[in-house]
């Protein structure tokens, strides 16, 4: 409801401003009827002028009445505002509520100044009303309407300021406006004076125990101490106890390989079996259809045991057996009798430092250990050579004719083999150095007399329609097979063209010919 009433007030004020503009626009026209007109013009058709003026006066009267109604409405609204805001403060919007064409644009200000600004605007309304009345009186009392020149009137006295209007009714509560744009950052203030030092704070809680520090770097070595004097010779110690028996010695080297045994006697040869007659060879039948797998037949009777074949040659010697396990240690010997302590010698004088002795010789070998137990049986040796094959057995009966198999599907057509080309382009697919194949080697062509006809024949051998000669293409290596090639352009091969003999040239590889086929 509050927003609708505000819209009505704005429409009402807009219509007031429109009427004020209309009056302002009409007043310059009415200035032609002033008494002090220097050159009064005679009016013809007084009846027509009277009718026009009557209509104009009616319109002015209606406008004045409407303006009066608006003033009364504004007074009621002021009373309502005063009732809502007992302390004289008004909550208003940022845009002006009342503005006139003749009055300065006065915006409503918050709190105490709002009511004063509204009263000032009402006084402007009263002033404009009085001016309209004076203009109306001037029009009605203008002697020119009756073609009578009137005397110039004296200026009227200045009007007294109008009494303040009655406060209007309080208006509806204004809606909350949209959030304004963020203001610009203010200039930084001047740094204030330094405050007094604060009082000493209370002692903080004891912090957690820190992690143990890393180990420090090794310190520098201290100074080398002085060399001490040689100590006195010690007393001869008692004879030590008898040492324990030494460990078993290493396993001895393996013995030499034994002599090969004598070959055994050959066993008696078995009697040969009767040879069967050879059957007639049947005609090869057509490949039959793949038959279904037959039922598994009964197991045949075991055949008569054949005569044993001759005894095979003895097998190779078996692999070396694993070494036997280490024998148990022998029993410890009885301890030796302790020797009597020697007589203490006289303390000798301090001797000089002796020369470092030579390395002693290697001690004698220890007593060999007990013989170990017999080793485990070695793994069996490799299989002997295969015996001689037995004689061929009798030929079996011919089998039954198989059914013809289904005709196989026709195989796919194979890809066409690539034909060997005797010419090629090096350095690109259709542009590069021209090379020919002769005497099982690739070689280049000299560019002497090399022209487009020669290049066209060369490209025709590769399936192109025409070619363009490139002189001094270079970059080749090996043989230079052709020189002074002279084709007419209709040949199918360079072999048909006029040229020097193969390998006869006076060129270097900087003069190798090139082609560009299309």
Swiss-Prot record:
It comes from the Eukaryota. GO terms for cellular component: collagen trimer; cytoplasm; plasma membrane. Residues 154-163, 293-314, 325-344 have a biased composition (Low complexity). Residues 70-518 are extracellular. It is found in: Cell membrane. Expressed in subpopulations of macrophages in the spleen and the medullary cord of lymph nodes (at protein level). GO terms for molecular function: amyloid-beta binding; cargo receptor activity; G protein-coupled receptor binding. Disulfide bonds join 446-507, 459-517, 487-497. Residues 147-426 are annotated as: Disordered. The keyword Signal does not apply. Residues 423-518 form the SRCR domain. The keyword Transmembrane helix applies. Residues 239-250, 410-421 have a biased composition (Basic and acidic residues). Keywords: Cell membrane, Collagen, Disulfide bond, Glycoprotein, Immunity, Innate immunity, Membrane, Receptor, Signal-anchor, Transmembrane, Transmembrane helix. Homotrimer; disulfide-linked. Trimers may assemble in larger oligomers thus resulting in the creation of a large surface capable of interacting with very large ligands. Pattern recognition receptor (PRR) which binds Gram-positive and Gram-negative bacteria. Also plays a role in binding of unopsonized particles by alveolar macrophages. Binds to the secretoglobin SCGB3A2. PANTHER family: COLLAGEN. This is Macrophage receptor MARCO. It comes from Mus musculus. The lineage of its organism: Eukaryota, Metazoa, Chordata, Craniata, Vertebrata.
């Amino acid at each position: 409801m509050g927003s609708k009433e505000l819209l009505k007030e704005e429409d009402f004020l807009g219509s007031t401003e429109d009427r004020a503009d209309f009056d302002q626009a009409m007043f310059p026209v009415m200035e032609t009827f002033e008494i002090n007109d220097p050159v009064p013009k005679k009016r013809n058709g007084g009846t027509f002028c009277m009718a026009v003026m009557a209509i104009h006066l009616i319109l002015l009267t209606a406008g004045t009445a409407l303006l009066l109604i608006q003033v009364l409405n504004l007074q009621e609204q002021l009373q309502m505002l005063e009732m809502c805001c007992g302390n004289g403060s008004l909550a208003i919007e940022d845009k002006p509520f009342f503005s006139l064409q003749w009055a300065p644009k006065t915006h409503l200000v918050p709190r105490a100044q709002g009511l004063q600004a509204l009263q000032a605007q009402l006084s402007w309304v009263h002033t404009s009303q009085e001016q309209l009345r004076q203009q109306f009186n001037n029009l009605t009392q203008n002697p020119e309407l009756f073609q009578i020149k009137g005397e110039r009137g004296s200026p009227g006295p200045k009007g007294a300021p109008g009494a303040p209007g009655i406060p209007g009714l309080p208006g509806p509560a204004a809606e909350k406006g949209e959030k304004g744009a963020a203001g610009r950052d203010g200039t930084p203030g001047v740094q204030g004076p330094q405050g007094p030092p604060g009082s000493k704070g209370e002692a903080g809680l004891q912090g957690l125990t820190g992690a143990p520090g890393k180990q420090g770097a090794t310190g520098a070595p201290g100074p080398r101490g002085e060399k001490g004097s040689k100590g006195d010779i010690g007393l001869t110690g008692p004879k030590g106890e008898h040492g324990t028996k030494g460990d078993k010695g290493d396993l001895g080297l393996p013995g030499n390989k034994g002599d090969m045994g004598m070959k055994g006697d050959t066993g008696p040869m078995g009697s040969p079996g009767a040879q069967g007659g050879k059957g007639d060879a049947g005609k090869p039948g057509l490949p039959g259809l793949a038959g279904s797998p037959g039922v598994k037949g009964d197991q045949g009777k075991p055949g008569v045991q054949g005569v044993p074949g001759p005894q095979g040659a003895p097998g190779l010697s078996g692999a070396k057996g694993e070494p036997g396990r280490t024998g148990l240690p022998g029993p410890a010997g009885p301890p030796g009798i302790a020797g009597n302590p020697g007589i203490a010698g006289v303390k000798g004088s301090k001797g000089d430092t002796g020369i470092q002795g030579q390395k002693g010789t290697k001690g004698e070998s220890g007593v060999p250990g007990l013989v170990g137990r017999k080793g485990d049986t070695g793994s069996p040796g490799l299989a002997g050579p295969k015996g001689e094959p037995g004689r061929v057995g009798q030929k079996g009966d011919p089998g039954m004719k198989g059914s013809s198999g289904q005709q196989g599907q026709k195989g796919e057509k194979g890809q066409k083999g690539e034909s060997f080309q005797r010419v090629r382009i090096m350095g690109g697919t259709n542009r590069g150095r021209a090379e020919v194949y002769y005497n099982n080697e690739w070689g280049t062509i000299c560019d002497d007399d090399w022209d487009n006809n020669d290049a066209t024949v060369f490209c025709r051998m590769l399936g192109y329609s025409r070619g363009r000669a490139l002189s001094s293409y270079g970059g080749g290596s090996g043989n230079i097979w052709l020189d002074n090639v002279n084709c007419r352009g209709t040949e199918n091969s360079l072999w048909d063209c006029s040229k020097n003999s193969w390998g006869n040239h006076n060129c270097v590889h900087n003069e190798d010919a090139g082609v560009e086929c299309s």
